From Swiss-Prot:
HAMAP family: Cytosol_peptidase_M17. Mn(2+) 2 binds at residues 260, 265, 283, 344. The gene is pepA. This is Probable cytosol aminopeptidase. It holds the Pfam family Peptidase_M17_N. The lineage of its organism: Bacteria, Bacillati, Bacillota, Bacilli, Bacillales. The active site is at 272, 346. It comes from Bacillus cereus (strain B4264). Binds 2 manganese ions per subunit. It catalyses: Release of an N-terminal amino acid, Xaa-|-Yaa-, in which Xaa is preferably Leu, but may be other amino acids including Pro although not Arg or Lys, and Yaa may be Pro. Amino acid amides and methyl esters are also readily hydrolyzed, but rates on arylamides are exceedingly low; Release of an N-terminal amino acid, preferentially leucine, but not glutamic or aspartic acids.
């Protein structure tokens, strides 16, 4: 699909950057010669807009061997960022998709500045081409055919091999994020814990990874009482899924991802209202993020060791479901007083974290749609983060900044630990109250990470969007897929 050339050679459409400057860039000046100065006129009359995300279409009318030019407004160069570029290109690729363009090119060097080099631009372009044109996978009987871009050419004077490599990496990042989106959007009667495990096994086999899927009896033998408690009310069997990627000869410095895989959450006996229950098919967004990251890792083969662990079940009501006031024993041996059955994700993750450590994880990152509290605190754009190790957190933060997936650190103080340890009947309680809900959930998980360097990512606000946006339609976003993969790719770098 991707090609690199030094000159244009006939395309349906070409994308060109347009910055807000006193004069036209050299790229536009050269093209304007073929248009006999008409582009300058269009700029002066503001029919070619330089505003951020503005897309202006100009037909060549036979003046060049390209049918149409799409000028992408990027605003002032001093305010140009990777986020600006992602948003603008997302809109540009959507425009091409709507026009049913199958052969497009991009004047890559027109997007390059002192802040962003050609490698950065190529990576983002290929990534966003997938993200921006993602279509919801629906179950409608009348499905519309979608015309997809078949050929994309980067026009640049830079080294072709380096640009091709950047395009490939960006494409893989975008595709894997879309894989996660599709998982999150699937209805809960289709995506059960069993189906999620089957998907994970297929992924592992495709990329020659080791894997384990623990069944209920094996979980009982290992004492995974926290996950099993959440599963008590369900007719669907639970699964503890593990994918193991060995990128080094020695099994050292193992990065462990733990993704919450609650395929549907009614709240259990602490029942959600109808409004709060609709959409809970997405409560396995953490699992999807982890699997998306493993898809990227499988494709790009970084020299790192990585474990992905997914505790999976649904949380439903029945005569056998677990109840408030129950006391359960986790795999770690720590006992937990259940005060809220709707705080089930942290119970499943507790056993997932302990199991990841058992498999050899030296570093832990858990990802979960864990609390409504994080949405109240940070909104729908920023992922909440907590940690027991600032060095590991800084690496996660840098990866999130590189991928434009913002995170914000929330605290863990001793008094927070005291609240989750406050139980007359057990070592811990799973829900100390509404105050500081996001912090309480993360603090609870920290009790199981213990001394292992750990970062918690609460994607409850960022996993899905209610409306269409520059990088895709309403629904799942694939939050943290690219951040996790970038963390692995950059892990340990100074």
């Amino acid at each position: 699909m991707f090609q690199v050339q030094k000159e244009l050679a006939g395309h349906e459409a070409v994308i060109i950057a347009l910055f807000e400057e006193e004069k036209m860039s050299s790229f536009v000046q050269e093209l304007d010669k073929a248009f006999e100065g008409q582009l300058q006129v269009l700029l002066e009359e503001k029919e070619l807009s330089t505003k951020k995300k503005a897309i202006s279409k100009v037909h060549s009318l036979g003046k060049t061997n390209v049918k149409r030019y799409y000028f992408v407004g990027l605003g002032k160069k001093e305010s140009y960022t990777t986020e600006t570029l992602r948003a603008a290109l997302g809109k540009a690729f959507k425009t091409l998709q709507a026009a049913k363009v199958q052969d497009a090119a991009m004047l890559l060097d027109s997007f390059v500045t002192e802040k962003l080099d050609a490698i950065d631009v190529a990576h983002i372009a290929a990534e966003v081409q997938g993200l921006g044109t993602y279509e919801l996978q629906t179950y409608k009987s009348d499905k519309k055919d979608c015309v997809e871009l078949e050929k994309f050419t980067a026009i640049t004077a830079e080294d072709a091999q380096e640009i091709e490599a950047a395009l490939t990496v960006g494409y893989v990042h975008g595709r894997a994020t879309n894989s996660a989106r599709t998982l999150v959007n699937m209805p809960p009667n289709v995506l059960t814990a069993t189906k999620l495990a089957e998907y994970a096994v297929e992924l592992a086999e495709k990329y020659d990874m080791d894997y384990k899927v623990l069944e209920k009896e094996e979980m009982e033998d290992l004492g995974m009482g926290a996950l099993l408690a959440v599963n008590q009310g369900s007719v669907e069997p639970p699964k503890m899924i593990a994918l193991i990627y060995k990128g080094k000869e020695e099994w050292t410095d193992v990065i462990g991802f733990v993704g919450k895989g609650i395929t549907y959450d009614t709240g259990g006996y602490s029942l959600k209202p109808r409004e709060g229950m609709v959409g809970m098919k997405g409560d396995m967004g953490g699992a999807a993020a982890v699997l998306g990251a493993m898809e990227i890792i499988g494709e790009l083969r970084p020299e790192q060791n990585v474990i992905a662990v997914i505790p999976s079940t649904d949380n439903v009501v029945s005569g056998t479901a677990f109840k408030p006031d129950d006391v359960i024993t986790s795999m770690s041996g720590k006992t937990i007083e259940v005060l809220n059955t709707d705080a089930e994700g942290r119970l499943a993750l507790a056993d997932g974290i302990t199991y990841a450590k058992k498999l050899g994880a030296n570093y832990l990152v858990d990802v979960a749609t864990l609390t409504g509290g994080v949405i109240v605190a940070l909104g729908n754009y920023t992922t909440g983060a907590m940690t027991n190790n600032e060095e590991l957190f800084e690496q996660v933060l840098e990866a999130s900044m590189e991928t434009d997936e913002p995170i914000w650190q929330l605290p863990i103080f001793d008094r927070d630990k005291e609240r989750v340890r406050n139980s007359k009947f057990a070592d811990l309680n799973n829900s100390p109250g509404r105050e500081g809900h996001a912090v309480m959930a993360g603090t609870f998980l920290g009790e199981f990470a213990e001394d292992t360097p750990w970062v918690h990512l609460d994607i409850a606000g960022t996993s899905e969007t209610k409306g269409a946006h520059d990088l895709g339609p309403a629904g799942a976003t694939g939050a943290m897929v690219r951040t996790l993969a970038t963390l692995v790719e950059r892990f340990g770098e100074e």
